[in-house]
Amino acid sequence: MSITLSDSAAARVSSFLENRGKGYGLRLGVRTSGCSGMAYVLEFVDEPATDDTVFEDKGVKVVIDGKSLQFLDGTQLDFVKEGLNEGFKFTNPNVKDECGCGESFHV
């Protein structure tokens, strides 16, 4: 099982954590949402819970709760700039379908 970050995603997360002044790492998870059923959740984590799994890639700790892990295994997180827009992009091999707006997915 693994989660990987591109160089640009690792740099962006590291910058956010440095500007925040504290934090253990980045929590990556899923929640029920949207027309396809699931959406990604990104938030800072100051301390992992006992049932969390922690991955480290390029110096960044990525924390995933036990329920989300099965849906996120093998995911790569990237940070992209497209025109005036920028944001995190997920490449998840478990996704079977996405909604038209790209806000949610189904596994």
Curated annotation (Swiss-Prot):
Entry's Gene Ontology BP terms: iron-sulfur cluster assembly
Functional summary from the UniProt entry: Is able to transfer iron-sulfur clusters to apo-ferredoxin. Multiple cycles of [2Fe2S] cluster formation and transfer are observed, suggesting that IscA acts catalytically. Recruits intracellular free iron so as to provide iron for the assembly of transient iron-sulfur cluster in IscU in the presence of IscS, L-cysteine and the thioredoxin reductase system TrxA/TrxB.
UniProt binding sites for Fe cation: C35, C99, C101
InterPro entries associated with the record: Fe-S_cluster_asmbl/transfer, FeS_biogenesis, FeS_cluster_insertion, FeS_cluster_insertion_CS, HesB-like_dom_sf, IscA_proteobacteria
Keywords: Iron, Metal-binding
Cofactor: Fe cation
Recorded family membership: Belongs to the HesB/IscA family.
Gene Ontology molecular function, alphabetical: 2 iron, 2 sulfur cluster binding; iron ion binding
GO cellular-component term (any): cytosol
Assembly and binders: Homodimer; may form tetramers and higher multimers.
Source organism: Enterobacter sp. (strain 638)
PROSITE patterns in alphabetical order: HESB
Disulphides: none
SUPFAM superfamilies (alphabetical): HesB-like domain (SSF89360)
Protein name: Iron-binding protein IscA
Annotated signal peptide: none
Pfam families: Fe-S_biosyn
PANTHER family with a match to the protein in the record: IRON-SULFUR CLUSTER ASSEMBLY 1 HOMOLOG, MITOCHONDRIAL, IRON-SULFUR CLUSTER ASSEMBLY PROTEIN
Cofactor, free-text remark: Binds 2 iron ions per dimer. The dimer may bind additional iron ions.
Listed Gene3D superfamilies: HesB-like domain (2.60.300.12)
